[in-house]
Amino acid sequence: MTRSEALFEQAKKTIPGGVNSPVRAFNGVGGSPLFIEKANGAYIYDADGKAYIDYVGSWGPMILGHNHPKIRAAVLAAVENGLSFGAPTELEVQMAEKVISMVPSIEQVRMVSSGTEATMSAIRLARGFTNRDKILKFEGCYHGHADCLLVKAGSGALTLGQPSSPGIPEDFAKHTLTAVYNDLDSVRTLFEQYPTDISCIIIEPVAGNMNCIPPIPGFLQGLRDICDEFGALMIIDEVMTGFRVSQSGAQGYYGVTPDLTTLGKVIGGGMPVGAFGGRKDVMQFIAPTGPVYQAGTLSGNPIAMSAGLAQMEALCEEGLYEELSAKTKRIAEGFKAAADKHGIPMAINYVGGMFGFFFTEQPEITRFDQVTQCNIEQFRIFYHGMLDEGVYLAPSAYEAGFLSMAHGEEEMRLTLEAADRVLASMKAAS
């Protein structure tokens, strides 16, 4: 028994399922999860000391790589002054100014402690501002585990084969409408059915919780137009895509302007953090200036703000996103080339520092129903083959992969050579 396996058995005695977030349990791929001891650059190291090239990156935040010296130095410097104050700090102001300078649609921003808090708060604000109850989300998209959002959700709930979760009253769920991602007609149908009831659309601009699904041309702008037509707010959930797809997020990359934006992951540099922001007239509706209540004991935590600021400043380096996109393209297209070489059907998607691959004969994947038709068993075999080769991918066929600036020529070469060997063995065994 490995030390990771022993720790997993020990953890299951005191932690439900042995993990603190379901996808980590490896239910989507089988076997026991790795317990991680440390990480540096493009590598993570398990409890047995084995190194892995990491394409999870703590589920997105580690865009510069693990244990980056500038972020580590910023955290250590902040710790010298104390861990938490429950009062305003200059760091919060600096972080707000930095976010606003990078995302033109954000005129004011409120810091919170997680992505779920950000989306939950943004939806409450949208409902309060419009005085409407219903929200519209998309099948296969995930926006955290708030009751109103865990309705036909993707991500962990989808991996577990549960389209929604017990514990959510029907009275909550009835206010959440679900449309088809990349299908404007399904959105318009719902708005025509409830023309004055829908407060907002919330969307992942690149769906990263049904693997990686970019928007088709015109889709995001079409949503913007429908919101304007019916008087609803548009919320772009950039918890995953914010500052990972481009310096101004997916909204900048695709040229669409939302009313509200949610952020997380990258803006914390690896620390727990979230944020929501947008139009000033909407943001002024939040307490203490407005009637919509939102609060948090650790919101704007100085350690998280310090780590996030260091990362955000580093992301302003010229040419960084072009280099990151080139790395991502190489990995995604390298996987596809290896699969083609060995006669294994595969489709790929990638944008910015995100990528996805699908074992399928479908030529392209643009919708949730297509994702569910992919070969999950082939993914599981490939996953464990890559793990044995020292490559750590997301342990679910429904999660995106992430590149970092720390992934260099050597790491990419080793990854693609490993993929070639694993796919060759899969073909030989078929």
UniProtKB/Swiss-Prot annotation:
Q: Quick one: a GO cellular component term? A: cytoplasm
Gene Ontology biological-process entries = protoporphyrinogen IX biosynthetic process
Catalytic activity of the protein: (S)-4-amino-5-oxopentanoate = 5-aminolevulinate
Q: Which SUPFAM superfamilies match?
A: PLP-dependent transferases
Q: Give GO MF terms, alphabetically.
A: glutamate-1-semialdehyde 2,1-aminomutase activity; pyridoxal phosphate binding; transaminase activity
Q: What does this protein need as cofactor? A: pyridoxal 5'-phosphate
Q: What is its EC number?
A: 5.4.3.8
Kindly give the Pfam families that the UniProt entry links to this protein.
Aminotran_3
Give the pathway annotation. Answer: Porphyrin-containing compound metabolism; protoporphyrin-IX biosynthesis; 5-aminolevulinate from L-glutamyl-tRNA(Glu): step 2/2
Instruction: Quote the subcellular location field of this record.
Output: Cytoplasm
Residues modified to N6-(pyridoxal phosphate)lysine? K265
Q: Which keywords has UniProt assigned to this entry?
A: Cytoplasm, Isomerase, Porphyrin biosynthesis, Pyridoxal phosphate
Quaternary structure note: Homodimer.
Family to which this protein belongs: Belongs to the class-III pyridoxal-phosphate-dependent aminotransferase family. HemL subfamily.
> What name does this protein carry?
Glutamate-1-semialdehyde 2,1-aminomutase
Q: What's the gene?
A: hemL
